[in-house]
């Protein structure tokens, strides 16, 4: 039996990784995982609580373990956290264990998609746009570094983007 390939979705907050990932997994008959949801299941607490109690460093440690564990599976679609690429170990795991798809979006779209979401600790500030711009400056080159495929998600439905990914991957 042929080995099933993994698809890892990377990109900023609000790019649509979780929504697109669910569509993609369903269309390809693969298992879907979301690293943030997995962290919440393992800790029994939401991401905001983990950030409050353990800080970003504690969250990133948990995230690295979850992604290391999940990326060892075969035949999954994994939606990663936006900041996961800041870890060289995570970038190496993703690159070595599957196809990395960078879901690219503009800051304007990120702001629009995340403005009412209170579950994003890094955006609970007076100027979330500034935070998103600063994060993009740091993270976008890292997404590009490990991406096998780059897909723009602005002004397209999750299903259309999932179809584009399938087409680009030749599945």
UniProtKB/Swiss-Prot annotation:
Top EC class of this enzyme: transferase
Predominant place of localization: cytoplasm
Pfam families membership: SKI (PF01202)
GO annotation, biological process: amino acid biosynthetic process; aromatic amino acid family biosynthetic process; chorismate biosynthetic process
Binding site for ATP: 14-19, 120, 156
Note accompanying the cofactor annotation: Binds 1 Mg(2+) ion per subunit.
Subunit structure: Monomer.
Protein name: Shikimate kinase
Organism: Shewanella sp. (strain ANA-3)
Source species taxonomy: Bacteria, Pseudomonadati, Pseudomonadota, Gammaproteobacteria, Alteromonadales
């Amino acid at each position: 039996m042929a080995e099933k390939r993994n698809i890892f979705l990377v990109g900023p907050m609000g790019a649509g990784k979780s929504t697109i990932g669910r569509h993609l997994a369903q269309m390809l008959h693969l298992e879907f995982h979301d690293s943030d949801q997995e962290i919440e299941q393992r800790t029994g607490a939401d991401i905001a609580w983990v950030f409050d109690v353990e800080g970003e460093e504690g969250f990133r440690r948990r995230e690295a373990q979850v992604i290391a564990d999940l990326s060892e599976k075969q035949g999954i679609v994994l939606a990663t956290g936006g900041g996961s690429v800041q870890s060289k170990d995570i970038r190496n795991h993703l690159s070595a264990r599957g196809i990395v798809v960078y879901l690219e979006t503009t800051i304007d779209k990120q702001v629009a998609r995340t403005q009412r979401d209170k579950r994003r600790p890094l955006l609970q500030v007076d100027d979330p746009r500034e935070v998103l711009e600063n994060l993009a400056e740091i993270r976008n080159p890292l997404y590009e570094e490990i991406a096998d495929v780059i897909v723009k998600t602005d002004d397209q439905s999750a299903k259309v983007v999932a179809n584009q990914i399938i087409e680009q991957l030749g599945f």
